């Protein structure tokens, strides 16, 4: 004679850390469900299908993988982080990111302005339809993009130190339902699989990018559009310079010509930098006219889209301000396979432009 036992998994109490428990209890209250404490049944946790986290100090998302019905997760931090010591920044960390990678039911994931993560692994999040990774200034690597085949929205830009995404062209081609594509300007060569040795590219990827009417963006002075916290399809608070694909093709082609004319093919990195600096010094003037315009992005060369702080205005129009020079230089360096990133640009009423230099973890005006 054998005994049968009832499966009590639904009644089992799952204890979560206080930070995560508080987030969940707040979300439950918004849904009209009263719950207190850090212990949850599976039935209660399964009520949480979406979560928006405005990161605070002491954040701890360990255990978030217990939200087995979680479909939409947005993690953001509203404060500008450039130039701040890490102790003055709130951000999720690598352990939190690993916990998020265990949320297998996610269809929408946004990671915005998190300074303590260096790697994001989405290889296990195969249900994703919408992915936004933006303004994470110390993010170096995104793993597993090639495992995603159901993406409808892909937004990756403003990640200042992100390594090249070698399979980005395949990601674009393999996601047949892709509808929204918003990427960093520096990712264009990766998106078309540009070969710096012979100048060839993936023409099929380029055709799809053009068909999607992709957006190509450059972040300005550490700002990020808070409207994108609400939805990645809304960018009314435009704190970046934006180009369409036709403009990117023009920018790319002229940049390739500049490299051909000013940088010897087989030279080292130092000679490449000198050649690029020589071109910018001789051919890009300061956009004095745009300085009096009220819009942060507007260029006297090409209005809103050109962006006085953008590489397009510098390379195509020969005029720029502030980050327009560095954005142009970054793109030219990218074509030579040289990695670079912007540092903080600080502006005030008495000093229009002040260089900020990090020394021994402190930020000192130079």
Locate each region found by the language model.
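Hydrophobic/aromatic-rich core segments of domains that either
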Residues: 324-366
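Secondary-structure boundary elements
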Residues: 244-314
């Amino acid at each position: 004679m054998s005994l049968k036992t009832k499966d009590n998994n639904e009644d089992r109490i799952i204890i979560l850390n206080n930070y995560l428990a508080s987030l969940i209890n707040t979300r439950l209250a918004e849904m009209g469900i009263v719950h207190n404490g850090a212990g949850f049944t599976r039935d209660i946790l399964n009520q949480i299908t979406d979560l928006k986290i405005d990161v605070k100090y002491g954040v701890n998302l360990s255990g978030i993988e217990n939200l087995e019905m979680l479909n939409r997760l947005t993690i953001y931090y509203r404060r500008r982080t450039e130039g701040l010591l890490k102790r003055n920044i709130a951000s999720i960390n690598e352990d939190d990111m690993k916990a998020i990678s265990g949320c297998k039911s996610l269809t929408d994931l946004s990671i915005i302005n998190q300074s303590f993560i260096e790697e994001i692994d989405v290889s296990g999040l195969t249900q994703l339809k919408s992915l936004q990774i933006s303004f994470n200034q110390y993010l170096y690597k995104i793993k597993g993009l090639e495992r995603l085949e159901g993406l409808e929205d892909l937004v990756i830009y403003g990640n200042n130190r992100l390594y090249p995404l070698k399979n980005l062209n395949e990601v674009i081609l393999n996601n047949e339902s892709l509808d929204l594509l918003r990427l960093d300007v520096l990712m264009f060569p990766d998106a078309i699989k540009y070969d710096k040795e012979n100048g060839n590219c993936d023409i099929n990827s380029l055709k799809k990018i053009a068909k999607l009417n992709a957006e190509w963006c450059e972040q300005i002075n550490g700002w990020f559009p808070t409207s994108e916290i609400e939805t990645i399809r809304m960018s009314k608070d435009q704190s970046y310079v934006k180009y369409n694909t036709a403009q990117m093709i023009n920018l790319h082609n002229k940049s390739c010509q500049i490299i051909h004319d000013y940088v010897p093919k087989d030279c080292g990195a130092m000679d490449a930098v000198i050649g690029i600096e020589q071109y910018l010094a001789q051919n890009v003037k300061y956009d004095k006219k745009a300085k009096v315009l009220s819009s942060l992005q507007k260029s006297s060369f090409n209005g809103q889209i050109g962006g006085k702080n953008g590489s397009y205005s510098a390379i195509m129009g020969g005029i720029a301000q502030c980050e327009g020079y560095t954005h142009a230089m970054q793109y030219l360096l990218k074509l030579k396979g040289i990695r670079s990133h912007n540092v903080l640009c600080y502006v005030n009423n008495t000093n229009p432009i002040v260089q900020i230099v990090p020394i021994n973890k402190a930020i000192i005006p130079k």
